[in-house]
Each structure stands twice: as C-alpha cells, then as structure tokens.
C-alpha cells in the first residue's frame, strides 16, 4: 500500500475526501516512491479516485490503475477543509470521545471507513493476485494494518505512516 505524497493544505486543516492539491515537492517525493517500489511487478494496481493518489499512481507508471471509492480517506463531512481549532459543538466532543464509532458531522465514523476498506480487502483475497499495489491514504492503510492485526484501533493516530510511505500488507 502506497500513501500519497504531501498535500498543499495549511497545517491544522481537517481534510479527508476533499480533492486537495499536492505540494510543489511532489516530483521529488514521487521519485522516492518509485525507488521503493522497484522492482514492482504487480498483478493488479488499484487507486483511490482522489487526484492525490491517481497522480502518484500515474507518476509511478500505472496509468491504468483501477479506481475504487472504498480506498478513499475518511469522509469528514461538514468538517472538511475547516481548521481543527475552529471546530466545536457536541458532535465534535462526541467524536473526540468515541471517534471509532461516532460519525463526523455529515460524514462517517472510522468504523464506517474500516468496513469499506475491509470489504475491499476481503474481495482482494478472493482474487487470484499475489502482488497488488494500492495507492491510497493514511487512514486506509491504518484500516488495513488493523485488519491484519499489525496495530489496534487505539494505535491509529500514534502509528500513522508519513506521506509517500510504501507499506507491505499481507492479507
């Protein structure tokens, strides 16, 4: 699983399924991803449909990556593109206390995201592929790591992989 490169969003901004731009350092970061993927011979290549993932997949030579909405980041609903420090209200407090099961305002819960990611992984397991590349997001990779038992739900925020990471997941 490959996490997209750094996004051009002000620090402290809540974003998930918003199609945000990448930083000017994209090519340099993407070259490092290409090096980590070599000699990448994949039976199939998938990508989140968000441009930050599609652009990286194409840069890495996978113009025909299969787009799958289940690989999108968490939907933060009305919180998208708001500064975390400006968010308030009972829904935010409930989310902070029970972020696994509480949906964001107008969005989804982490458990909602986990279910769609595990549905993708369950489907992938039934296919005859041995090696698959998946261009996606930090939250999706965290869900996959929970699915395989590498981390727990409680470790999601303390073990988030950096932008441009390549993480081998065995399902």
PLM regions and their residue ranges:
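Histidine-centered catalytic micro-motifs
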Residues: 1-5, 135-140
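Short beta-strand scaffold positions
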Residues: 47-48, 115, 135-136
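Active-site-proximal alpha-helix that buttresses catalytic centers in soluble enzyme cores
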Residues: 2-63
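Short, active-site-adjacent cap segments at secondary-structure transitions
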Residues: 8, 52-54, 73, 140-143
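Generic beta-sheet signal
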Residues: 128-136
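Phosphate-handling substructures
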Residues: 60-115
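Active-site signature of alpha/beta-hydrolase-fold catalytic machinery across serine-
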Residues: 59, 143-147
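Domain-level recognition of soluble alpha/beta enzyme cores
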Residues: 151-171
